[in-house]
Amino acid sequence: MTEQVPAIDTLGRDSWRIFRILSEFVEGFEELAALPPAVAVFGSARSARGSRDYQRALEMGRALVEAGYAVVTGGGPGDMEAANRGAKEAGGESIGLAIELPHEEGPNPYLTTSLSFRYFFVRKFMFVKYSQAFVILPGGFGTLDEMFEAITLIQTKKTRPFPVVLVDDDGFWDGLLDWIENTLVARGKVSAGDPAILRRARTPAEVVEILRTTKVPEKAR
Protein backbone atom coordinates (compact mmCIF):
# COMPACT_ATOMS: atom_id res chain seq x y z
CA MET A 1 0.00 0.00 0.00
CA THR A 2 1.39 3.38 -1.01
CA GLU A 3 1.88 5.80 1.86
CA GLN A 4 -0.13 8.99 1.53
CA VAL A 5 2.03 12.11 1.61
CA PRO A 6 0.26 15.07 3.24
CA ALA A 7 -0.43 17.89 0.81
CA ILE A 8 1.50 21.08 1.46
CA ASP A 9 -0.74 24.07 1.97
CA THR A 10 1.09 26.18 -0.62
CA LEU A 11 -1.88 28.46 -1.19
CA GLY A 12 -2.15 29.28 2.49
CA ARG A 13 1.55 29.99 2.84
CA ASP A 14 1.58 32.15 -0.28
CA SER A 15 -1.37 34.13 1.04
CA TRP A 16 0.47 34.92 4.27
CA ARG A 17 3.59 35.82 2.28
CA ILE A 18 1.65 38.82 0.93
CA PHE A 19 1.87 40.45 4.36
CA ARG A 20 5.67 40.14 4.42
CA ILE A 21 5.84 41.68 0.94
CA LEU A 22 3.54 44.53 1.95
CA SER A 23 5.56 45.19 5.10
CA GLU A 24 8.74 45.53 3.03
CA PHE A 25 7.07 48.04 0.71
CA VAL A 26 5.70 50.03 3.66
CA GLU A 27 9.05 50.11 5.46
CA GLY A 28 10.83 51.20 2.29
CA PHE A 29 8.32 53.98 1.61
CA GLU A 30 8.50 55.28 5.18
CA GLU A 31 12.31 55.21 5.42
CA LEU A 32 13.01 56.71 1.99
CA ALA A 33 10.16 59.19 1.52
CA ALA A 34 12.26 62.14 2.71
CA LEU A 35 15.38 61.10 0.80
CA PRO A 36 16.98 63.98 -1.14
CA PRO A 37 17.86 63.52 -4.83
CA ALA A 38 19.81 60.27 -4.98
CA VAL A 39 21.93 58.22 -7.35
CA ALA A 40 22.20 54.43 -7.15
CA VAL A 41 25.70 52.98 -7.52
CA PHE A 42 26.10 49.32 -8.49
CA GLY A 43 29.29 47.29 -8.75
CA SER A 44 31.17 44.25 -7.59
CA ALA A 45 30.92 42.99 -4.02
CA ARG A 46 34.33 41.38 -4.56
CA SER A 47 36.46 44.50 -4.96
CA ALA A 48 39.08 44.37 -2.21
CA ARG A 49 39.75 47.36 0.02
CA GLY A 50 42.66 49.29 -1.41
CA SER A 51 42.15 47.94 -4.93
CA ARG A 52 41.80 50.20 -7.95
CA ASP A 53 38.12 49.33 -8.33
CA TYR A 54 37.42 50.03 -4.65
CA GLN A 55 39.16 53.39 -4.88
CA ARG A 56 37.15 54.35 -7.97
CA ALA A 57 33.88 53.50 -6.20
CA LEU A 58 34.97 55.51 -3.16
CA GLU A 59 35.72 58.52 -5.36
CA MET A 60 32.35 58.03 -7.07
CA GLY A 61 30.47 58.23 -3.79
CA ARG A 62 32.37 61.33 -2.76
CA ALA A 63 31.86 63.06 -6.12
CA LEU A 64 28.12 62.39 -6.12
CA VAL A 65 27.69 63.86 -2.64
CA GLU A 66 29.74 66.92 -3.60
CA ALA A 67 27.41 67.31 -6.60
CA GLY A 68 24.39 67.36 -4.29
CA TYR A 69 23.20 63.74 -4.40
CA ALA A 70 22.62 61.08 -1.79
CA VAL A 71 24.20 57.71 -2.62
CA VAL A 72 22.21 54.47 -2.64
CA THR A 73 23.86 51.04 -2.92
CA GLY A 74 23.10 47.43 -2.11
CA GLY A 75 24.68 48.01 1.29
CA GLY A 76 27.22 45.21 1.01
CA PRO A 77 31.01 44.96 0.69
CA GLY A 78 33.31 45.82 -2.21
CA ASP A 79 32.22 48.64 -4.50
CA MET A 80 29.04 49.12 -2.47
CA GLU A 81 31.01 49.70 0.72
CA ALA A 82 33.42 52.00 -1.09
CA ALA A 83 30.67 54.18 -2.59
CA ASN A 84 28.92 54.40 0.77
CA ARG A 85 32.22 55.22 2.46
CA GLY A 86 32.95 58.01 0.01
CA ALA A 87 29.46 59.42 0.49
CA LYS A 88 29.57 59.29 4.28
CA GLU A 89 33.08 60.72 4.54
CA ALA A 90 31.94 63.60 2.32
CA GLY A 91 29.13 64.31 4.79
CA GLY A 92 26.28 63.05 2.63
CA GLU A 93 23.39 60.64 2.90
CA SER A 94 24.62 57.06 2.46
CA ILE A 95 21.87 54.48 2.00
CA GLY A 96 22.14 50.71 1.83
CA LEU A 97 19.34 48.51 0.46
CA ALA A 98 20.55 45.05 1.40
CA ILE A 99 19.17 41.69 0.33
CA GLU A 100 18.90 38.75 2.72
CA LEU A 101 21.14 35.99 1.36
CA PRO A 102 22.71 32.90 2.95
CA HIS A 103 26.40 33.25 3.81
CA GLU A 104 26.30 36.97 3.06
CA GLU A 105 28.05 39.62 5.13
CA GLY A 106 25.97 42.12 7.05
CA PRO A 107 25.58 45.76 6.01
CA ASN A 108 28.80 47.71 5.57
CA PRO A 109 29.69 50.23 8.32
CA TYR A 110 29.32 53.38 6.19
CA LEU A 111 25.53 53.73 6.09
CA THR A 112 23.37 56.53 7.42
CA THR A 113 20.24 54.53 6.51
CA SER A 114 20.10 50.75 6.22
CA LEU A 115 17.22 48.59 5.00
CA SER A 116 17.12 44.84 4.47
CA PHE A 117 14.84 43.04 2.02
CA ARG A 118 13.89 39.41 1.61
CA TYR A 119 12.47 39.92 -1.88
CA PHE A 120 14.59 41.10 -4.78
CA PHE A 121 11.63 42.67 -6.59
CA VAL A 122 10.77 44.93 -3.65
CA ARG A 123 14.39 46.02 -3.38
CA LYS A 124 14.58 46.73 -7.13
CA PHE A 125 11.42 48.81 -6.89
CA MET A 126 13.03 50.98 -4.21
CA PHE A 127 16.16 51.52 -6.29
CA VAL A 128 14.13 52.68 -9.29
CA LYS A 129 11.61 54.77 -7.35
CA TYR A 130 14.11 56.70 -5.25
CA SER A 131 17.07 57.14 -7.63
CA GLN A 132 17.50 59.83 -10.26
CA ALA A 133 20.19 57.80 -12.06
CA PHE A 134 21.97 54.44 -12.04
CA VAL A 135 25.77 54.35 -12.09
CA ILE A 136 27.04 50.93 -13.16
CA LEU A 137 30.61 50.06 -12.17
CA PRO A 138 32.28 46.85 -13.38
CA GLY A 139 30.55 43.94 -11.68
CA GLY A 140 29.03 40.50 -12.04
CA PHE A 141 25.57 38.98 -12.44
CA GLY A 142 23.94 41.12 -9.75
CA THR A 143 25.24 44.31 -11.35
CA LEU A 144 24.06 43.17 -14.78
CA ASP A 145 20.66 42.28 -13.34
CA GLU A 146 20.15 45.80 -12.01
CA MET A 147 21.38 47.35 -15.28
CA PHE A 148 19.10 45.25 -17.50
CA GLU A 149 16.15 45.86 -15.16
CA ALA A 150 16.63 49.61 -15.61
CA ILE A 151 17.02 49.60 -19.39
CA THR A 152 14.06 47.23 -19.80
CA LEU A 153 11.81 49.54 -17.78
CA ILE A 154 12.96 52.50 -19.87
CA GLN A 155 12.65 50.60 -23.17
CA THR A 156 9.11 49.45 -22.38
CA LYS A 157 8.15 52.90 -21.04
CA LYS A 158 7.26 51.51 -17.63
CA THR A 159 9.31 54.36 -16.17
CA ARG A 160 10.38 57.75 -17.39
CA PRO A 161 13.87 57.74 -18.92
CA PHE A 162 16.71 58.32 -16.47
CA PRO A 163 20.49 58.16 -16.91
CA VAL A 164 22.03 54.68 -16.80
CA VAL A 165 25.78 55.24 -16.91
CA LEU A 166 28.36 52.51 -17.50
CA VAL A 167 31.70 53.41 -15.94
CA ASP A 168 35.09 52.01 -16.93
CA ASP A 169 38.47 53.21 -18.15
CA ASP A 170 39.82 49.87 -19.36
CA GLY A 171 37.21 48.62 -21.83
CA PHE A 172 35.36 46.45 -19.31
CA TRP A 173 32.00 47.18 -20.96
CA ASP A 174 33.22 47.07 -24.58
CA GLY A 175 32.31 43.43 -25.19
CA LEU A 176 28.80 43.82 -23.82
CA LEU A 177 28.13 46.94 -25.86
CA ASP A 178 29.53 45.33 -29.01
CA TRP A 179 27.19 42.35 -28.48
CA ILE A 180 24.19 44.63 -27.99
CA GLU A 181 24.99 46.57 -31.17
CA ASN A 182 26.33 43.82 -33.43
CA THR A 183 24.09 40.95 -32.33
CA LEU A 184 20.90 42.25 -30.71
CA VAL A 185 20.45 45.25 -32.99
CA ALA A 186 21.88 43.53 -36.08
CA ARG A 187 19.49 40.59 -35.70
CA GLY A 188 16.49 42.77 -34.97
CA LYS A 189 16.09 41.73 -31.34
CA VAL A 190 16.08 45.32 -30.11
CA SER A 191 15.51 48.63 -31.89
CA ALA A 192 18.42 50.56 -33.36
CA GLY A 193 17.93 53.36 -30.84
CA ASP A 194 17.82 51.15 -27.75
CA PRO A 195 21.59 51.06 -27.08
CA ALA A 196 21.47 54.84 -26.61
CA ILE A 197 19.70 54.22 -23.29
CA LEU A 198 23.15 53.41 -21.91
CA ARG A 199 25.63 56.23 -21.38
CA ARG A 200 29.37 55.83 -20.79
CA ALA A 201 31.86 57.57 -18.53
CA ARG A 202 35.48 57.01 -17.57
CA THR A 203 35.65 58.95 -14.31
CA PRO A 204 33.41 60.18 -11.48
CA ALA A 205 33.76 63.70 -12.87
CA GLU A 206 32.35 62.55 -16.21
CA VAL A 207 29.42 60.89 -14.44
CA VAL A 208 28.65 64.11 -12.59
CA GLU A 209 28.83 66.04 -15.87
CA ILE A 210 26.33 63.64 -17.48
CA LEU A 211 23.96 64.17 -14.57
CA ARG A 212 24.45 67.93 -14.74
CA THR A 213 23.67 68.13 -18.46
CA THR A 214 20.87 65.54 -18.57
CA LYS A 215 17.28 66.23 -17.63
CA VAL A 216 16.93 63.97 -14.62
CA PRO A 217 13.34 63.09 -13.64
CA GLU A 218 11.87 63.43 -10.19
CA LYS A 219 12.46 60.37 -8.03
CA ALA A 220 8.80 59.31 -7.86
CA ARG A 221 8.02 57.00 -10.77
Predicted region positions:
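Acidic/glycine-enriched connector segments
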Residues: Q55, G78-I136
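Active-site/ligand-binding-proximal alpha/beta "capping" segment
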Residues: R118-G171, T213-R221
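PLP-dependent amino-acid enzyme catalytic core
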Residues: A7, V26, L32-L35, Y54, ...
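Glycine-rich beta-alpha loop segments
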Residues: Q4-L97
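Solvent-exposed alpha-helices and their adjacent loops that cap or buttress functional pockets
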Residues: L32-A34, A63-V65, K88, E105-P109, ...
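C-terminal functional extensions of proteins
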Residues: V167-D169, D174-R221
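Short gly/pro/ser/thr-enriched loop/turn and capping motifs at secondary-structure boundaries
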Residues: L101-G106, T143, G171-D174
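Short beta-strand segments
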Residues: F42-G43, G74, L97-E100, L137-P138, ...
